[in-house]
Amino acid sequence: MEVIDFSATKKREPMKHHAALPNSVRAIIIGPSGSGKTQLLLNLIMRFMKWDKLYLVAPSVDDQRCYKVLKDYNENASEIKGESVIDFITDIDDAPSVDDLDGDINNLVVYDDVMLDNQKNPARIFSRGRHKNTDVIYVAQRYTQIPQVIRDNCNVLVVFNGINIHTLRNVWNTWCSDMDFNRFKNYFSHAQSVPHGFITINLHDPRSRYRIGLDQIYG
């Protein structure tokens, strides 16, 4: 009796975001101050991800000039749609819970520099947000200080130039079981060769799992 491989006949879902990203994004972006994290984040929000409602949770959102582009965009979009498309949230206790999210639209929740705050909210969004059609991005300087539940539920990791060898080895040990450490260091050296360079690891796409930046496939 022939056994049919139904996985081979399953239709591929239409691409929702940039090719480097899965359709359901649970991403961590790490790198030291000034490495380029915020500029990449703005590009993801404004160019590379599809969303209808954005929740930006950042204690210093009112002090960062780089977020002015989002405030201007929100002002213009609000005039057209009659409602705000971006919520700027400075207190993590005011961030939406999973139950608050509208699963009928594309939600994006971003946590930027919230390491010193209560981590229950981002942990729950990383764990359950996909059931409410919600993508999530967590931006931080130190990978090992991010709560384990967030790291365990992450499916995209972006690592910027400037991290220390301890963090690099921790990333390799967790994410890159299919290559030895020397090869991983060679892979990361591409990020070190250019200003604001970074690597992207996507667990959901084995054919292009490792990228230099967003576009160049490694390996």
Predicted segment positions?
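An amphipathic, basic-hydrophobic helix/alpha-beta surface used to engage anionic
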Residues: 54
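A general structural signal for short secondary-structure junctions and capping/turn motifs
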Residues: 19-20, 45-48, 149-150, 188-193
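Pre-Walker A adenine-sensing motif
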Residues: 3-21, 42
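Conserved AAA+ ATPase small/helical "lid" subdomain
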Residues: 179-218
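Short linear motifs in intrinsically disordered/low-complexity regions
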Residues: 6, 64, 94, 103, ...
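Conserved P-loop NTPase motor cores
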Residues: 25-49, 59-67, 73-182
